[in-house]
Amino acid sequence: MEGINNFKTPNKSEKRKSVLCSTPCVNIPASPFMQKLGFGTGVSVYLMKRSPRGLSHSPWAVKKISLLCDDHYRTVYQKRLTDEAKILKNLNHPNIIGYRAFTEASDGSLCLAMEYGGEKSLNDLIEERNKDSGSPFPAAVILRVALHMARGLKYLHQEKKLLHGDIKSSNVVIKGDFETIKICDVGVSLPLDENMTVTDPEACYIGTEPWKPKEALEENGIITDKADVFAFGLTLWEMMTLCIPHVNLPDDDVDEDATFDESDFDDEAYYAALGTRPSINMEELDDSYQKAIELFCVCTNEDPKDRPSAAHIVEALELDGQCCGLSSKH
């Protein structure tokens, strides 16, 4: 690949009603009666088992607004959850989590029900691996995740003209031994124009700080589909390093039993590193990782024009399982 070798408002009640009216009546239990699967900013995700009258139905993952949110943030998260429901309902792709319902629970909180097949987030798997072996995921697994994520992003970008806006390991769910790989949490997605650019002046790129590209950190940065590609590259980096981008803990020569103190965190270095490509310890990765490293590097080029599109990543990865030959001009 050229360049790859060189890398050293409507009324809220009305809005809610319009979404809920198209959803059949669903009885969502109160939070204490469901198993908690995880949580995010302002929301929690629960397992809802559905077996009425002795019938067996597939379970759902139910995302609910946290009851602990104050009124201001509750309004923000309610809008975000409503937006996510409206977007998710119109998506249909094997690498995007499926919509099931949007309604209110018995405690009055808004709920988004999604498909659930026993998945864990990629972030959970990274944390588990860090505690167990501490070794990177096999290169073949990383490339499999890359292909399935790229297919989901290609669908969002090309067919739905949507920027996901918050790609990271926490927003990828995995079933079993990487049998299925799906992107979730489309609540901060932004519309793309025909040039794959976010042009809506009211649109605000949310993202999550360590995964943000340089253009999203600039005051007048132009956001395109390549913002997702940058965060996608950092997600592959997470699988190779088992770390959060740019959040550097003490050096390896520090006593393993030593407690990490918040005062040890270098704020200045962290903020200076945001939007850049984090380094990789090449001594920990053998030759089998070369393709994954190349893909990570080209996706995290600072200039968005030098990153491949999701469609081109898919094309390259599907060609005999190879990812060499990626051009940075797509």
Curated annotation (Swiss-Prot):
It comes from the Eukaryota. Its EC number is 2.7.12.2. Residues 31-330 form the Protein kinase domain. InterPro entries: Kinase-like_dom_sf (IPR011009), PKc_TOPK (IPR041989), Prot_kinase_dom (IPR000719), Ser/Thr_kinase_AS (IPR008271). One of its GO terms (molecular function) is MAP kinase kinase activity. There is a cross-link at K168 (Glycyl lysine isopeptide (Lys-Gly) (interchain with G-Cter in SUMO2)). The modification Phosphoserine is found at S31, S58. The modification N-acetylmethionine is found at M1. This is Lymphokine-activated killer T-cell-originated protein kinase.
